[in-house]
Amino acid sequence: MLTLEIITPDAKVYSSQADGVEIPTESGEIGVRTTHIPLVTKLVAGELKVSKDGSVESIAVDYGFVKVLGDTLSVLTEAAINVSDIDLGEVESAQARAEEALKKAELEGTDPAEVERLSSSVRYLIAQKLAKGRSRRA
């Protein structure tokens, strides 16, 4: 079994044993099982899937980093939420507001760091919607 920890700047939001984990990375989705080679890679906004005892739990994650060492998988991310806790209406509303703020910032020549922050927010909200949509079909 793997020990999985998901940590945000605010708290450790998830800690559990898992048979395997599917992780969204810059180079595509990777699967981690026990005895995986040591790895550090960049995490992208998307759906992280935790397999345990024959079931799969989905967690929407923002960008960050992943470290695999031995049978421990550490995910350091700006934000994470269990798909079962996502309110789709709230996410769609937040996405519309974030996209509007992003358009305004780009038109006004806002500081590039602020534009990237807004763009990241939009990506994370899209990841939540996609993850929630997949979980309802499963």
Stretch-by-stretch model annotation:
Residues 1-3, 134:
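N-terminal export/targeting signal detector
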